[in-house]
C-alpha cells in the first residue's frame, strides 16, 4: 500500500542522469520506473557497482539476465533495455553481501558494455522520453485499462483488492502502465516486452491485450473450480449423511453396550468383598457414572477407577504352607547355604502356625551382587505357597511411583505398590523391593520417605494410594528389600528393616552351587544331556579360581554357559562325538587364557603392604605403596583417596614418628623427608579407616628400610597411640584375602567375635591373628620387637594358631 501511494505522487525533480552508469544485472526480476524494490546482492562485480553508485550519484542501471544460471553475464546474456534506478539505502551484511533498496527512475537502452578499472561493468546509456499528450483517446485507453485491471484483481486471489483503488488514482499513462504491469502475475518475458515499449499508449494497449487473456483464463479456472466444488459438495454431503447415519446406529448400539458395561460393574461391585470405606467410595462413583453420558471423558475416568477398585484383592489371600519340613525342603532345593535366611523364614512359619495372624516381616537382604538375594526371595514365596511380585527401585525419583497420581491428572494411575498387589492377585504376596539403596530424589519428591508408610508394620495396614484415595491393608504382605550397601539407605527407612547379611561365597560354596544348580540349569538351557557334557576333576575349581573374581556366581554362570555353547558347537560339527570332557589341560582351548592369577608374588618388598577393604560388591585386597624422598616433611596421598582415608594416613604417620625411638628410626629423618602414599587403581574411589594399620606398617617399613612379608594382609583402624580399633565386614575381607592366596591375616582383637561367621574350610587354611596394638603388627610383619613378648593368635584351629 505504501509502495503504491509513493507511485501515485510525482517527483518534483528528476536527478541528472549521466551518459555512463554502473551496470547491475538481476535475475528473474523486471524493474519498472517508479517501482521501489529491495535487492540482495552477492556477486563481486555487482557489489562493486553498488559501492561505486553510492560513492557518486547513487544511480545504477538495472537490467534483467536472459538466463538466471549465468554467474558472470556478457552483453549477449542481458536484455538491451532496462531501468535507471536510484539507490535509496544500502546495508552491508556480516557475510560480505549487500542489501539495497532501489527506485526505478527511467527506461534506458545500453549502448556500450565494458569492464571498468574498478572491477565493475559500466554501460553507455540512451535515455527514452516518455512524455504523452493528453488526448481523449489516451484517456479512454486509461479508463479501459483500469476497468480491466479491477476485474482482474477481483478474479485473482493473489492480488490485494486495495491495489485497484491506488491504481485508479494515477493520472499519468506511463506511470499507470508501469504500475499495473508490475502487479500482473505473468511470465517475465511478457513483463520485459512491456518494459521495452517506450510509447505509453502502445504499452497500455499491450497491457489491455494481456489483461483480456488473463481474465478469460481466470474465468475458465473459476468455472472449473465451481464445477469441482459442486461435485465435492455433493460427494461430501452424501458422505456426511452416510456417516451421520452410521453414528446414529453406533450411538444406539453403544448405549446398549454402555448399559451392559454398567450392569456388569454393578454386579461385580455387589459380589466383591472389600472394606466399608472402599465400598462407600465405589458406590459414590457408581452413582456419578449412572448420571453421565457413556462417551464423556469423565465417565471414562470413573469407569477406570471403578475397575481398579474392583480388581484389587481386598480380602483374597493365598493359604500359607505351614509344613515346616516341606518349606525347608523347597528352600534347600533352590539354594545352597544361606542358612540365616532359611532359618528366618522357618521361624516366621512356626509363629504363624500358632497365632494364625501375624504382621508380615520387613526383611532387608544386604550383600554383594550375585549372591542370591533376589532368587532366595522367590524361593521364600514358593516355600510359603504365596504369590511373588517384584519391583526395582533403582533410579526411582518420583514419589508418585510409590503412592500413585491423584485422579485430577490426565492419565493418572495407582503407584507401583498397588499395581503389583493387583498383579499378584492376593493381599499377602511375597513382595520384593529390589535395590532400595539406589533410590533417588528430586523436585518431584522423595520416594524413600513414601516407602516409610509401606514398610512400617504399624502404619501399612492403612496404606493410602493417591489414586484410590482409600486405605489398603498391606500388613499381610511379606516385604523383602535388597541392597548392596547400607550407606545410601536413609536412617528413618533403615530403622524399619530387619537386616540379613549375605556374604561372598567361598570357592567350596561356589563349587557346590555350580554342581547342584548352575551346571544342570545351563545344560537344560543349551539342550545338552548330562552324559554329553562332562567336567573332569579339578576343571571346575580352575574355572572358579582363574576365570572368575567375584563375590557371587554371575560370572561363573557366564563362563559355564560359554563352555556349554562351545560343547554344543563341537558336537554339532562332529556328529560322531558322543560327549566332550572339560579337563584342566583343555580349559584354555574353550575359555582362553586365565583372567586371574590367585597366587601372589612371594618376594617381600619395602613399603608395600596389603590391606583389606569392603565394598558394596564384596571384599577386596588393597595394595598400599609408600616411598620416601628428600623434602620438608610433607605427606603426599594419591589413588583417589577419601577424606577419612587421608586422615587415617596422617594418623599412621604421626604414630610412626612418635614411635621412632622404639622402631630404631633416626628422628632427624622426618624433618628433611617427604612421604608419598599411593594406592593403585587410581580411578577407583577408596575411603574408610580400616586401612590404618596397613598404612602405618608401610610407613614404618620405609622408615626402617625393612621389607614387609608379602603373604600377610591386615585390616584395622589405628589411633595416634598405636591402638588397633575394630572394623566392619571382616568376613568379606577374609574371603577376599583367601581368594588372593594370602596365608596370614592380622585383624583387630575386638573383632574376634566375628570369626564365627567365617566358613570353617577358609579358617583352616589361614592364620587369623588378632592384634590390639601396632607393636604387634610391626613385629609380625617386619621384625619382632624385644619388648613385645605376648603376640596373640587365634587358638580356634589347632596347629594353624600361633
Curated annotation (Swiss-Prot):
EC number: 3.4.21.53
Entry protein name: Lon protease
Annotated source species: Endomicrobium trichonymphae
Localization, UniProt: Cytoplasm
Catalytic activity: Hydrolysis of proteins in presence of ATP
A Gene Ontology BP annotation from the UniProt entry: cellular response to heat
Gene Ontology CC: cytoplasm
Enzyme superclass (EC): hydrolase
NCBIfam families: lon (TIGR00763), PRK10787.1 (NF008053)
Gene that encodes it: lon
Binding, ATP: 367-374
Subunit-level organization: Homohexamer. Organized in a ring with a central cavity.
Pfam family, one: LON_substr_bdg
Keywords: ATP-binding, Cytoplasm, Hydrolase, Nucleotide-binding, Protease, Serine protease, Stress response
Amino acid at each position: 500500500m505504501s509502495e503504491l501511494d509513493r507511485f501515485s505522487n510525482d517527483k518534483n525533480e528528476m536527478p541528472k542522469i549521466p551518459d555512463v552508469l554502473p551496470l547491475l544485472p538481476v535475475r528473474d526480476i523486471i524493474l519498472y520506473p517508479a517501482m521501489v524494490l529491495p535487492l540482495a546482492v552477492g556477486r563481486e562485480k555487482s557489489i562493486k557497482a553498488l559501492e561505486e553508485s553510492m560513492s557518486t550519484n547513487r544511480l545504477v542501471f538495472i537490467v534483467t539476465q536472459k538466463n538466471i544460471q549465468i554467474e558472470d553475464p556478457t552483453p549477449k546474456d542481458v536484455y538491451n533495455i532496462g531501468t535507471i534506478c536510484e539507490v535509496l539505502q544500502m546495508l552491508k551484511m556480516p557475510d560480505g553481501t549487500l542489501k539495497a533498496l532501489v527506485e526505478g527512475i527511467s527506461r534506458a537502452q545500453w549502448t556500450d558494455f565494458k569492464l571498468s578499472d574498478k572491477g565493475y561493468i559500466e554501460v553507455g546509456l540512451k535515455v527514452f522520453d516518455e512524455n504523452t499528450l493528453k488526448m481523449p483517446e489516451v484517456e479512454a485507453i486509461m479508463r479501459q485499462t483500469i476497468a480491466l485491471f479491477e476485474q482482474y484483481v477481483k478474479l485473482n486471489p493473489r492480488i490485494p483488492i486495495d491495489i485497484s483503488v491506488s491504481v485508479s488514482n494515477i493520472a499519468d499513462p506511463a506511470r499507470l502502465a508501469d504500475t499495473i504491469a508490475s502487479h500482473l502475475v505473468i511470465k517475465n518475458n511478457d513483463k520485459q516486452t512491456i518494459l521495452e515499449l517506450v510509447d505509453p499508449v502502445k504499452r497500455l494497449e499491450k497491457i489491455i491485450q494481456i489483461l483480456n487473456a488473463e481474465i478469460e483464463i481466470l474465468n475458465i479456472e473459476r468455472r472449473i473450480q465451481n464445477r469441482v466444488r459442486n461435485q465435492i459438495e455433493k460427494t461430501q454431503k452424501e458422505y456426511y449423511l452416510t456417516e451421520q447415519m452410521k453414528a446414529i446406529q453406533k450411538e444406539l448400539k453403544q448405549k446398549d453396550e454402555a448399559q451392559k458395561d454398567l450392569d456388569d460393574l454393578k454386579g461385580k461391585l455387589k459380589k466383591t468383598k472389600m472394606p466399608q470405606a472402599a465400598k462407600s467410595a465405589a458406590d459414590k462413583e457408581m452413582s456419578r457414572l449412572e448420571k453421565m453420558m457413556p462417551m464423556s471423558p469423565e465417565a471414562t475416568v470413573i469407569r477406570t477407577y471403578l475397575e481398579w477398585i474392583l480388581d484389587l484383592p481386598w480380602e483374597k489371600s493365598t493359604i500359607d504352607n505351614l509344613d515346616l519340613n516341606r518349606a525347608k525342603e523347597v528352600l534347600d532345593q533352590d539354594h545352597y547355604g544361606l542358612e540365616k535366611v532359611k532359618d528366618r523364614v522357618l521361624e516366621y512359619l512356626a509363629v504363624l502356625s500358632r497365632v494364625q495372624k501375624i504382621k508380615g516381616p520387613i526383611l532387608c537382604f544386604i550383600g554383594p551382587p550375585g549372591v542370591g538375594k533376589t532368587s532366595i526371595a522367590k524361593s521364600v514365596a514358593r516355600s510359603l505357597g504365596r504369590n511373588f511380585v517384584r519391583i526395582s527401585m533403582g533410579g526411582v525419583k518420583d514419589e508418585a511411583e510409590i503412592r500413585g497420581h491423584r485422579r485430577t491428572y490426565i492419565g493418572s494411575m495407582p503407584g507401583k505398590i498397588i499395581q503389583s498387589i493387583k498383579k499378584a492377585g492376593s493381599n499377602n504376596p511375597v513382595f520384593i523391593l529390589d535395590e532400595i539403596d539406589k533410590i533417588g530424589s528430586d523436585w518431584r519428591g522423595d520416594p524413600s520417605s513414601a516407602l516409610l508408610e509401606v514398610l512400617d508394620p504399624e502404619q501399612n495396614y492403612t496404606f493410602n494410594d493417591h489414586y484410590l484415595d482409600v486405605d489398603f491393608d498391606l500388613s499381610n504382605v511379606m516385604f523383602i528389600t535388597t541392597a548392596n550397601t547400607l550407606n545410601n539407605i536413609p536412617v528413618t527407612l533403615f530403622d524399619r528393616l530387619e537386616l540379613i547379611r549375605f556374604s561372598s561365597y567361598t570357592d567350596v560354596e561356589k563349587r557346590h552351587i555350580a554342581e547342584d544348580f548352575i551346571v544342570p540349569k545351563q545344560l537344560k538351557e543349551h539342550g545338552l544331556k548330562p552324559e554329553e557334557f562332562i567336567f573332569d576333576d579339578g576343571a571346575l575349581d580352575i574355572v572358579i579360581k582363574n576365570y572368575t573374581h567375584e563375590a557371587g556366581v554371575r560370572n561363573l554362570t557366564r563362563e559355564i554357559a560359554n563352555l556349554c555353547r562351545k560343547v554344543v558347537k563341537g558336537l554339532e560339527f562332529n556328529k560322531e562325538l558322543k560327549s566332550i570332557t572339560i579337563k584342566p589341560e583343555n580349559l584354555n582351548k574353550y575359555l582362553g587364557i586365565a583372567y586371574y592369577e590367585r597366587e601372589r608374588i612371594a618376594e617381600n618388598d619395602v613399603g608395600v603392604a596389603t590391606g583389606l577393604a569392603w565394598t558394596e560388591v564384596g571384599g577386596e585386597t588393597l595394595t598400599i605403596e609408600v616411598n620416601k624422598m628428600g623434602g620438608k616433611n610433607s605427606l603426599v596421598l594419591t589413588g583417589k583417596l577419601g577424606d577419612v582415608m587421608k586422615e587415617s594416613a596422617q594418623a599412621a604417620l604421626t604414630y610412626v614418628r612418635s614411635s621412632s625411638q622404639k622402631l630404631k628410626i633416626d628422628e632427624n629423618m622426618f624433618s628433611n623427608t617427604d612421604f608419598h602414599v599411593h594406592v593403585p587403581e587410581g580411578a577407583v574411589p577408596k575411603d574408610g579407616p580400616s586401612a590404618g594399620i596397613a598404612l602405618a606398617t608401610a610407613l614404618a617399613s620405609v622408615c626402617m628400610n625393612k621389607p614387609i612379608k608379602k603373604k600377610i594382609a591386615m585390616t584395622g583402624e589405628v589411633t595416634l597411640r598405636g591402638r588397633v580399633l575394630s572394623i566392619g565386614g571382616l568376613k568379606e575381607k577374609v574371603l577376599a584375602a583367601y581368594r588372593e592366596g594370602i596365608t596370614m591375616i592380622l585383624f583387630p582383637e575386638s573383632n574376634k567375635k566375628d570369626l564365627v561367621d567365617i566358613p570353617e574350610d577358609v579358617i583352616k587354611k589361614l592364620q587369623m591373628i588378632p592384634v590390639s596394638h601396632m607393636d604387634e603388627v610391626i613385629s609380625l610383619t617386619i621384625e619382632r620387637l624385644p619388648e613385645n613378648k605376648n603376640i596373640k593368635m587365634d587358638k580356634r584351629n589347632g596347629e594353624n594358631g600361633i
